[in-house]
């Protein structure tokens, strides 16, 4: 494994990961053991969903984020599938809607109650039937409302209008083998896919055409994945011919050679990439690994810059990633992962260390919000639009609320003589120290204290006398000036 050791300037160089305390984990969850390389976990600012083991069908758990600690075995699940659930994903435009794909060849879309489940949810809002083999991939369109993509082991990609349960597009001739994953581009005009035939394809779903293809993007036989980046480039993970895990960056305009190719190690778990378009950081989580590596993607060679590795003791069965709008910006949190162990889910917080308490504009540019940019019908008609952006500044809460304190000091508490006495009123100035001295005496009752107060009193009297004489001289000079004698 060879990472570049050249020190380069980056605000993400010191990003560090930290697991939360045990009482903030989700304990006693029976994570699914099904053989499939999906994340098994989906999370949004309201809910955490985890695919779990279930007898007699498929199920997944939906928990409010605040429901940490031990999860009772009788806690209600979403359990309408007749076969194991393989993939789940929250709708980006509605935090209460989640889609699931299953071995029973169906896609189901569910509406989760506002406060979470109080009883098992068996009735989906809509059932989408069109695949002839198990459905291993479901992914929502990033900007068009109610548009959902599903891909099955029948090598078919279907695109649905969930609002009408209508099949919009069927792409059944572009993939000759099992589809490992699918990823939309930023505005949802194209998607890329990774296939068992070792090819990465870029596809226009509305025309049903192949825009670009790279055969043998990674030469190894193990699963690979491909995701679109914000600038249109494609990031892939896979294996070399010698079964070493690899990362690569591709320019869709020229797929002949990768812009960058890095080898990581010789572990055999599939690498799951998670991309943050706001920071251009890619987090790579290996199934069965106990680490999360992260890289910054830039326009400068070598393009993929290794930042750091978060390592823990337990291997991960799956990982979910919180959308940017669900992070705590006041703590400089730039990513949060939900790591699945065999029996629990552990949040891991990625933080950029900053000294200032102020909102960090450079870490939090405007990000994709929950509002859809298009309706399904507009997208079908050929319109494209980027995500509707929101500012995270309103979510910022200062970590330290400082109270204003005004301190008024008694002139006698300072041992040094002060020239702050009022020169215009020398007569009443003398009794004031005497009263203060009397008060100090009654409180202190010590001879030393009395002597100190008397010294201060004498100094103040001398000061008052001096100021009085000075005022007299000034008045005398003023009189001569007015009389024209000066």
Swiss-Prot record:
WD repeats lie at residues 80-120, 130-170, 174-213, 217-260, 265-305. InterPro entries: Coronin, DUF1899, WD40/YVTN_repeat-like_dom_sf, WD40_repeat_CS, WD40_repeat_dom_sf, WD40_rpt. Residues 446-484 form a coiled coil. The keyword Cell membrane does not apply. It is found in: Cytoplasm, Cytoskeleton; Cytoplasm, Cytoskeleton, Stress fiber. The keyword Phosphoprotein applies. Phosphorylated in vivo by PKC in response to cholinergic stimulation. Phosphorylation on Ser-2 regulates the interaction with the Arp2/3 complex and cell motility in fibroblasts. Phosphorylation does not seem to affect subcellular location. The modification Phosphoserine is found at residue 2. PANTHER family: CORONIN, CORONIN-1B. Forms homooligomers, but does not form complexes with the other coronins. Interacts with Arp2/3 complex components, including ACTR2, ARPC1B and ARPC2. Binds actin. Belongs to the WD repeat coronin family. This is Coronin-1B.
């Amino acid at each position: 494994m060879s990472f570049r050791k050249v020190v380069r300037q980056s605000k993400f160089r010191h990003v560090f990961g930290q697991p939360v305390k045990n009482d903030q984990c989700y304990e006693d969850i029976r994570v699914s053991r099904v053989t499939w390389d999906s994340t098994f976990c989906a999370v949004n600012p309201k809910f955490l969903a985890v695919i779990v083991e279930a007898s007699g069908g498929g199920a997944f758990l939906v928990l409010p984020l605040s429901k940490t600690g031990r999860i009772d075995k009788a806690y209600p699940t979403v359990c309408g599938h007749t076969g194991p659930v393989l993939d789940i994903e929250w709708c980006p435009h509605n935090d209460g809607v989640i889609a699931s794909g299953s071995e029973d060849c169906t896609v189901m879309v569910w509406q989760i109650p506002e406060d979470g489940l109080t009883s098992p949810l068996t009735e989906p809002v809509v059932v989408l039937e069109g695949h002839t083999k198990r459905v291993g991939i479901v992914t929502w369109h990033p900007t068009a409302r109610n548009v959902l993509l599903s891909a099955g082991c029948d090598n078919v990609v279907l695109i649905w209008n969930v609002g009408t349960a209508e099949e919009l597009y069927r792409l059944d001739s572009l993939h000759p083998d099992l589809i490992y994953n699918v990823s939309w581009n930023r505005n949802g005009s194209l998607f890329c896919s990774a296939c068992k035939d070792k090819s990465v394809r870029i596809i226009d779903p509305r025309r049903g055409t192949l825009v670009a293809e790279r055969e043998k993007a990674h030469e190894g036989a193990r699963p690979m994945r491909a995701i679109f980046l914000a600038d249109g480039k494609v990031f892939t993970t896979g294996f070399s011919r010698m079964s070493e895990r690899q990362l690569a960056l591709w320019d869709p305009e020229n797929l002949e050679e990768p812009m960058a190719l890095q080898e990581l190690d010789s572990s055999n778990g599939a690498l799951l990439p998670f991309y943050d378009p706001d920071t251009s950081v890619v987090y790579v989580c290996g199934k069965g690994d106990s680490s999360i590596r992260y890289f910054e993607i830039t326009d400068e060679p070598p393009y993929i810059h290794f930042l750091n590795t978060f390592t823990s003791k337990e291997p991960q069965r799956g990982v979910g990633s919180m959308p940017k709008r669900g992070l705590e910006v006041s703590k400089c949190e730039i990513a949060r992962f939900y790591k699945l162990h065999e029996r629990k889910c552990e949040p891991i917080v990625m933080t950029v260390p900053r000294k200032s308490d102020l909102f960090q504009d450079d870490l939090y540019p405007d990000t994709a919000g929950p509002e859809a940019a298009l309706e399904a019908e507009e997208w079908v008609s050929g319109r494209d639009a980027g995500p509707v952006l929101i500012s995270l500044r309103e979510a910022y809460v200062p970590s330290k609320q400082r109270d204003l304190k005004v301190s008024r000091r008694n002139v006698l508490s300072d041992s040094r003589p002060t020239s702050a006495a009022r020169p215009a009123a020398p007569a009443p100035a003398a009794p004031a120290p005497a009263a203060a001295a009397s008060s100090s005496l009654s409180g202190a009752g010590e001879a030393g204290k009395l002597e100190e107060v008397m010294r201060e009193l004498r100094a103040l009297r001398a000061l008052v006398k001096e100021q009085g004489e000075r005022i007299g001289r000034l008045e005398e000079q003023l009189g001569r000036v007015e009389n024209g004698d000066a």
